[in-house]
């Protein structure tokens, strides 16, 4: 799911791949420092669509850029792109309170078994990862024969590892958390939904939120059924390569995508990677819908912004710190979370 640095030269020939390389995070040495401090390489962001700014201008004077139209005007306008039918962008769709709620759920509840994460393949189901990271615990291979792992306090590590068992800190595992799945579980090895796997239903509050935002993209007379969700976790330098979300049965139903945390660049391509993609900012609280023809469009995340001057999460950090202490705020300072809710059947 996450992009490898090893990409063939042939891939550079597509418009989508060129855009990925244009916006990806690269470092360059700062000549001002003798120890050769590295800084993010400047990039040209002038061509990015900024729906936050577009929304402000529209609310002030009703003006829209060429190729952009408004599909719905309520308390929060919904924007569309003329040559990408089925794509909807809702800026600031989630309040700060809602953003804080779903950040906390994404870190505490969503990785809990029976939900699966990228860690399952190596460590099996992991309970209470976030709390264990807060408490500086270490995951130790407790049983070499059955590959069972257990969290220990740091003071107990020497005793726990006397049999040369492997260990890894909970804080490292939290930072390496890349995805979790809610509702019907997605099998990444088979690239399909496995209804035989144990699972819990998606939380009611998240279902209702998804239904509310999905309504504008639904066929007339139908209601969105949230049956599965994938939560993506991005850290510094992480990307999500160009891909299609094509494992659901009915592409007329939208994917509801909620952005939380650091600002990102989103690429929306066409049905071929040769089609030049639209590049746009995604900020915390934005919601994107992709339905119908838009489900056939390649899309990805080539960059997240984690610097204080570019992440655009000052208010979110303050709210998180006030509500829940510094640990959530410290995590989100260098992270982005994306919740994608889907109707599977």
From Swiss-Prot:
Catalysed reaction, written as an equation: an N(6)-methyl-2'-deoxyadenosine in DNA + 2-oxoglutarate + O2 = a 2'-deoxyadenosine in DNA + formaldehyde + succinate + CO2
Keyword RNA-binding assigned: no
Pfam families membership: 2OG-FeII_Oxy_2
Enzyme Commission code(s) on record: 1.14.11.51
Subcellular location: Nucleus; Cytoplasm
GO cellular component: cytoplasm; nucleus
Residue span, Fe2OG dioxygenase domain: 225-345
Residues that hold 2-oxoglutarate according to the record: 232-234, 336-342
Family matches, as SUPFAM superfamilies: Clavaminate synthase-like
Binding site for substrate: 179, 186-188
Cofactor: Fe(2+)
UniProt binding sites for Fe cation: 243, 245, 299
InterPro entries in alphabetical order: Alkb (IPR004574), AlkB-like (IPR027450), AlkB-like_sf (IPR037151), Oxoglu/Fe-dep_dioxygenase_dom (IPR005123)
Molecular function terms, GO-annotated: DNA N6-methyladenine demethylase activity; metal ion binding
Enzyme class label: oxidoreductase
Inactivation phenotype: Elevated DNA N(6)-methyladenine (6 mA) methylation levels. Plants lacking ALKBH1A and ALKBH1D show delayed seed germination associated with dysregulation of seed germination key regulators (e.g. FUS3, TPC1 and SPHK1) due to a high 6 mA DNA methylation state.
Family assignment from sequence similarity: Belongs to the alkB family.
Protein name: DNA N(6)-methyladenine demethylase ALKBH1A
